[in-house]
Amino acid sequence: MAGQSGRTFPRVAVLMGGASTEREVSLSSGHSCSAALRDAGYEVTEVDAGPDLARVLAELSPDAVFNALHGRWGEDGCVQGLLEWLRIPYTHSGVLASALAMDKARAKEVFAAAGLPVTQSVLATPEEVRARHILPPPYVVKPNAEGSSVGVYIVHEDANGPPQLAADMPQDLMVETYVPGRELTVTVMGDRVLAVTDILSDGWYDYDAKYRPGGSRHIVPADLPAEITEACHDIALRAHRALGCRGISRSDLRWDEARGLAGLILLETNTQPGMTPTSLSPEQAAHCGYSFPEFCAWLVEDASCSR
């Protein structure tokens, strides 16, 4: 039953922070979403997720949880399982889709089985990557279960040897063939594709380019041939469905213009996209006529268990 505000879930707990390498990004998303939801008429409690999260949520007993967590434990199925156990409706994808999307290697297997275009990749340990070229250069090395381009290395064709990785790299690394071309991203909202964004940055679209002011420019909608735009929409929607995503997802692609349609490659799908007003998915929602409070409210009203 709708509350006095006319909302199905008038009392919302916004989960943010957590203990992953993306904590600061999550806090930024969480504070932005909290302010937007208050503007939309919700009663909001901000929750910095910690070891006592189950107790905190049980005491708060919110009508729904807005998940603004990023990275490990927040978007890999862990907190989703806790919310299912507590039977609190929550936003974004459920346990299985979240776990699959966070595991890049398994997500790629799902994409390949669905006939989506992916590039060659293998799993390796840091020791193996440091010892020899796992793939012919150029290739990319990145953690198999991290987001926000944390810990990404590019090995160029003229590299003298394998990369000297940081000592704190996780044991599961994905090594994949480097895909040249334009950086594109597409948000799916429910069963609707919002838009394609062309991301312009100086060099690799890394953590700094994503979050440092002026680190990149976003062109919405991307200036693309109609058949490429249509193909981007199709790939993003099929990826969303193949993983079983709910709420919103954002799929990242590369397009090598010289190869036409054959140059369009799906890199990964993110079940917990950044959620500040200037993040990629909210920008696309704004292009489609949704204010940031309306976009956040849509996510809350879409919340459920058994996702």
From Swiss-Prot:
Mg(2+) 1 binds at residues 252, 268. Keywords: ATP-binding, Cell shape, Cell wall biogenesis/degradation, Cytoplasm, Ligase, Magnesium, Manganese, Metal-binding, Nucleotide-binding, Peptidoglycan synthesis. Pfam families: Dala_Dala_lig_C, Dala_Dala_lig_N. The keyword S-adenosyl-L-methionine does not apply. It catalyses: 2 D-alanine + ATP = D-alanyl-D-alanine + ADP + phosphate + H(+). Coiled coil: none annotated. This is D-alanine--D-alanine ligase. It comes from Cereibacter sphaeroides (strain ATCC 17023 / DSM 158 / JCM 6121 / CCUG 31486 / LMG 2827 / NBRC 12203 / NCIMB 8253 / ATH 2.4.1.) (Rhodobacter sphaeroides).
